[in-house]
A protein has these predicted regions:
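Active-site and channel-lining beta-strand-loop segments
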Residues: 1-16
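Glycine-rich loop-to-alpha-helix module at the N-terminal edge of alpha/beta enzyme cores
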Residues: 13-99
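Short, small-residue-enriched loops and turns at beta-alpha junctions
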Residues: 23-25, 143, 162-166
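A short acidic, helix-capping loop that chelates divalent metal ions and anchors anionic groups
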Residues: 45, 108-109, 163-165
Length: 183
């Protein structure tokens, strides 16, 4: 691939509308990304998060001022990031439920499958999935309000559902959810 284009084994050209399921925002083989990756591989390919490394520290210094937070956790996948968020919500609230949306996708690990709103992904593992995920229709504030209980630890939603059919919420959806969470 190059940029937004990819080619199959027969040379047919396609526009990659998936962009690596939204992780290839720069396209394929972007020169700045290729150079940065090559430079990093020449120094250090991977270390556990047990060790500090200069690129991670420099990125955190740039990223954190853009947020209301004073620390971050690097994850290697969406599933790992989502598992971390779920565990933090459960641990620090002491509560047992997380509200999620129908047709959502949060990963393929057991915990993130439990949060995923696609029965076909969960079905083979139903008897082994963790409990506590309350599913509501996407873009439905009233359903979220009705689902909230004394055990609600978090509301876990995608800004735009991909697996659910590229569902874009109303402009006020996340503002209203933020207000609900602040209450």
């Amino acid at each position: 691939g190059k940029g937004v284009k990819v080619w199959d084994k027969d040379g047919n050209e396609y526009i990659d509308m998936f962009a690596g399921i939204a992780v290839n925002a720069l396209g394929h083989a972007h020169p700045k990304l290729v150079n940065a990756l090559q430079g990093q591989v020449e120094k250090l390919i991977h270390v556990s998060n047990i060790y500090y490394n200069e690129p991670a520290i420099e990125y955190a210094k740039k990223l954190l001022p853009l947020t209301e937070f004073d620390r971050l956790f690097y994850a290697n996948s969406g599933a790992e990031a989502n598992e971390g968020a779920i565990k933090l919500a459960l641990k620090y609230t002491g509560k047992s439920e997380i509200i999620t949306a129908k047709d959502s996708f949060h990963g393929r690990t057991l915990l993130t499958l439990a949060a995923t709103g696609h029965e076909e992904y969960r079905e083979p593992y139903l008897k082994n999935l963790p409990q506590g995920f309350i599913e509501v229709p996407y873009n439905d504030i009233e359903a979220i309000k009705e689902a909230i209980s004394d055990e609600t630890a978090a509301i876990m939603l995608e800004p735009i559902q991909g697996e659910g059919g590229v569902n874009v919420p109303s402009k006020k959806y996340f503002d209203e959810i933020a207000e609900i969470c602040a209450e």
